[in-house]
Amino acid sequence: MKTTMNFVFLFFLPLLINAKPKRVTLHIPLVHNGANFYDSKVVSLPLSSPHSQRGLAFMAEIHFGSPQKKQFLHMDTGSSLTWTQCFPCSDCYAQKIYPKYRPAASITYRDAMCEDSHPKSNPHFAFDPLTRICTYQQHYLDETNIKGTLAQEMITVDTHDGGFKRVHGVYFGCNTLSDGSYFTGTGILGLGVGKYSIIGEFGSKFSFCLGEISEPKASHNLILGDGANVQGHPTVINITEGHTIFQLESIIVGEEITLDDPVQVFVDTGSTLSHLSTNLYYKFVDAFDDLIGSRPLSYEPTLCYKADTIERLEKMDVGFKFDVGAELSVNIHNIFIQQGPPEIRCLAIQNNKESFSHVIIGVIAMQGYNVGYDLSAKTAYINKQDCDM
C-alpha cells in the first residue's frame, strides 16, 4: 500500500510543481458621474488627459489595503498605470469623496521594485538601489503631471452578486504629486498594456460594457480575467507603447463611407468625446451637411445645430467600422449632446487640429456596447448588447 501511495505521489508531483495558480476573474460594477458634457481632452500619449475627466467618467469602487479603504477610480483604457493619491501629499488636488489613501496604515502595503524605463517612456519608472524604492512620473500634454512611488497592495472588490473578491500584490501608483485640478474620484484605473498594469494580474482578457447614459437604471460593468465577455464581432488590434490600436476601415453617417487608407484608432474610456484628424472630421461634416440639409450653427471645434433640427431627424446611425467588419454605431440622438444652452445640440465628435493622424473614440460613442479584449490573441470583440450581468 505504501509503495502504491509513493507511486501516486511521485506521478502527480511534477503536475503540482508546474501547476499555475488559478487566476481570479473580477466582475466590477461601474457608475458614471452624470456630468455635463464638457471635454477639454488634449490628444497626448498617454491618451488620457486628466482634464478630460471634467466630462463623462465611468468609475469603479475598489478597496485598497488592510484594513480596507475605498477608492473611486476612473476607468481608463488610454493609460496603463493605476494610481491613487496617497497621504501625505503636499501638492495634490482636493478629493471630494473619500480621504487620501494612507499606506502606513495598511499591513498589506509594500514598496515595489522595478526596472528603470527608457528616459522617454511615459510613465517613466526609476529604481533607487539605496532606498530600494521605485518612483514614477507621468506627464500630460496639457501640462498636468503626476509623481509618486510604485507599490503593491491587496485590493478587494464588491462583486455584482453581493460578494467580494480579494487579489494580493497588485501594482499601483501611490501619488505624492497630482497637479491637475479636474480629476473625478480618487485616481485612475489604467487598463492599458504595461509591465505594471493591473491587466497583467488577471491574464490577457478584459471587457467593459457601457449602457445608455440617458437611462438612469442602465447597467455598466468591467470584467477582468478569463471570465471577460469576449464575444461579438472580432477585429484585429495592435499593441504599441502600451496602447491597443484598432484599424478603422470606414465611417458611417447614415450610409457607409469607405476610407482610402485604414486609420489607427484608440478606443479610450478616458475621453468623453471622440476626436478625428482634420481630414476625417470634414468627411463627417460634409456627410452631415448633405444628410440634414440645414445650416449648422458652428463647424468648429464641433458641429452644432438647434435642438429641434436634430430632434426632427429619424433614427440614423453614426459610427465606425473596423478591420474584419466589427462595427460600433450610435443612434444620432445619442451622439448629439447638449453643450452650452439647452436649445443647442453638438456632435460629440471634435476636430483634432494637432499633428496627430489617429482617431480617438470616447465613451459617448460606446453607449450600448460591450468591448472585449483578448490581448494574447491580439483581438478585440465589439458587441451591441444589454449590459446587465
Curated annotation (Swiss-Prot):
The positions flagged as glycosylation sites are 238
The enzyme's main class, written as a single word, is: hydrolase
GO biological process terms, semicolon-separated: pollen development; proteolysis; regulation of programmed cell death
The alphabetical list of record keywords is: Aspartyl protease, Developmental protein, Disulfide bond, Glycoprotein, Hydrolase, Protease, Signal
Gene3D superfamilies on file: Acid Proteases
Return the Pfam families for the record: TAXi_C, TAXi_N
Q: What is its EC number?
A: 3.4.23.-
Q: What happens when the gene is disrupted?
A: Premature apoptosis-like programmed cell death (PCD) in tapetum and pollen from developing anthers, leading to collapsed pollen grains.
Q: Where is the active site?
A: 76, 268
Q: Which SUPFAM superfamilies match?
A: Acid proteases
The disulfide bridges present are 86-92, 304-346
InterPro entries assigned to the protein according to its UniProt record, in alphabetical order: Pepsin-like_plant (IPR034161), PEPTIDASE_A1 (IPR033121), Peptidase_aspartic_dom_sf (IPR021109), Plant_Aspart_Prot_A1 (IPR051708), TAXi_C (IPR032799), TAXi_N (IPR032861)
Family the entry assigns = Belongs to the peptidase A1 family.
Give the note.
Answer: Plants silencing UND exhibit partial male sterility with reduced silique elongation and seed set. Premature apoptosis-like programmed cell death (PCD) in tapetum from developing anthers, leading to collapsed pollen grains.
Q: What does this protein do?
A: Probable aspartic protease activated by the transcription factor MYB80. May participate in the regulation of the timing of tapetal programmed cell death (PCD) which is critical for pollen development.
Q: Under which name does UniProt file this protein? A: Aspartyl protease UND
> Which species does this protein come from?
Arabidopsis thaliana
According to the entry, what is the taxonomic lineage of the organism? Answer: Eukaryota, Viridiplantae, Streptophyta, Embryophyta, Tracheophyta
